[in-house]
Amino acid sequence: MSKAATVPVAFQDREKPQEVRLSNIMAARSVADAIRTSLGPKGMDKMIQTGKGEVILTNDGATILKHLSVLHPAAKMLVDLSAAQDVEAGDGTTSVVILAGSMLACAEKLLKKGIHPTVIAESFQRAAGFTVDCMKENALAIELSDRESLLRAATTSLNSKIVSQYSNLLAPIAVDAVLKVIDPRVATNVDLKDIRIVKKLGGIIDDTELIPGLALTQTAVKSAGGPTRIEKANIALIQFQLSPPKPDMENQVVVNDYRQMDKILKEERQYLLNMCKKIKKAGANVILIQKSILRDAVNDLALHFLAKLKIMVIKDIERDEVEFICKSTGCKPIADIESFAEDKLGHADLVEETSSSGEKIVKFSGVKNAGKTVSILCRGANLLTLEEAERSLHDALCVIRCLVKQRALIAGGGSPEIEAAQRLLEHARQLEGREAICIRAFSEALEIIPVTLAENAGLNAIQVVTELRSRHANGEKTAGINVRKGIVTNILEENVLQPLLVNISAIQLAAETTKMIMKIDDITLAR
């Protein structure tokens, strides 16, 4: 009798909390299943039609989930999880959601065995810490001077995108862009605001290029015969309007004499001429005019005067471009004609309008006193391709940023997950009771990455994962799935590498989200 009393009684949850947990798990898993097919180089793409009727073609996890219409609060947690991974690492947004879905599936089995949710949550958290340590042990330290390693990481990121056939062109652009805006010896982070991706419809992705400094899609105004090429340019960015002043309130001015009308026109003409002369006197020969929603930023008469004074005009500069332009050209924004002075101008050897694949852009070359900025001119035959190329480039830039933050690479192809799963199983054998069962379940959850990679490549997932387990048990720590050849190989020899930070962040964020969902026992509607 006493023997029976010492056996721990299985956790019998109250009916409602159990239902809530299972409902949350089911909702979250449905989100993970929705994007599971888009993982890896052989993953499928999703076509999304937004509420406005726009069409998006992508296989980027964060983009898919951002546009997903999700109602269940637990499912929204997985959408937020993907967004958090995008902010932290910029890549691995699909993997993190798939991992969380797999962890929740294993947690559901443990709940049905009668293990308490808190025990599951805490065991998973410890297992995640053990997995991170295991991955750090197997990571390869790199230096930012090792351009080849940076290229391999950027190429691996691009290989799973729609634009994968252009990875040989886009990977060097991403690497060079990041290295141009940081000091590799001391940098610990990269501000991606210093790298501007300029989209221009036309041409093909092969025409994408890296431009040191500044490139604008807005073209020079030629309607009044203004110049399109200026050497030894003095650049001014103005935030006021070159058009006749208007009263702030709605007023009506009644003119009943043609001489008064003539006087008004003469005053307007003189007002604009004086403004243009002040600009010329300050030495500016290129002016960028910020877009105005109140009235015309520049009128035809002002353009005529500026053309006569041989001043190049580029209008419709967006508000969010101002900071980048100022940093790139060394100029300061000018809010009023009275504060127009030479010390607020930027200087460049050449500002010219060039034509590329039938489209015109303005390039600034030889900029003096410029901050560390670069522009990437992204080209594409249609809007869908162009936007996906921009997203892919952003992911590649984020991968290089990860390597600046944490200078270590890890093998891809499901290799680190299988290695960590094997190590967790060994660790679980040294433990007793429910924690050992939970850690075994966590190791099973990690195997979802190689399983999904194999399934998406059309391989036999059971056969591939069994071979991976066997190879890792025999000490082949870098054995992974070669999706291109459809076999298990030493993945390092195939140059399939990714930043350690991407994997670590994915494991930690997925485990935290699983823990949060496991701890929820009720959903209450607020008034």
From Swiss-Prot:
One of its GO terms (cellular component) is cytoskeleton. It comes from the Eukaryota. The keyword Chaperone applies. Gene3D superfamilies: GroEL (3.50.7.10), GroEL-like equatorial domain (1.10.560.10), TCP-1-like chaperonin intermediate domain (3.30.260.10). It is found in: Cytoplasm. Keywords: ATP-binding, Chaperone, Cytoplasm, Nucleotide-binding. GO terms for molecular function: ATP binding; ATP hydrolysis activity; ATP-dependent protein folding chaperone; unfolded protein binding. One of its GO terms (biological process) is protein folding. InterPro entries: Chap_CCT_delta (IPR012717), Chaperone_TCP-1 (IPR017998), Chaperonin_TCP-1_CS (IPR002194), Cpn60/GroEL/TCP-1 (IPR002423), GroEL-like_apical_dom_sf (IPR027409), GROEL-like_equatorial_sf (IPR027413), TCP-1-like_intermed_sf (IPR027410), TCP-1_chaperonin (IPR053374). Signal peptide: none annotated. PROSITE patterns: TCP1_1 (PS00750), TCP1_2 (PS00751), TCP1_3 (PS00995). The keyword Transport does not apply. Heterooligomeric complex of about 850 to 900 kDa that forms two stacked rings, 12 to 16 nm in diameter. PANTHER family: CHAPERONIN (PTHR11353). Belongs to the TCP-1 chaperonin family. Molecular chaperone; assists the folding of proteins upon ATP hydrolysis. Known to play a role, in vitro, in the folding of actin and tubulin. This is T-complex protein 1 subunit delta. It comes from Schizosaccharomyces pombe (strain 972 / ATCC 24843). The lineage of its organism: Eukaryota, Fungi, Dikarya, Ascomycota, Taphrinomycotina. The gene is cct4.
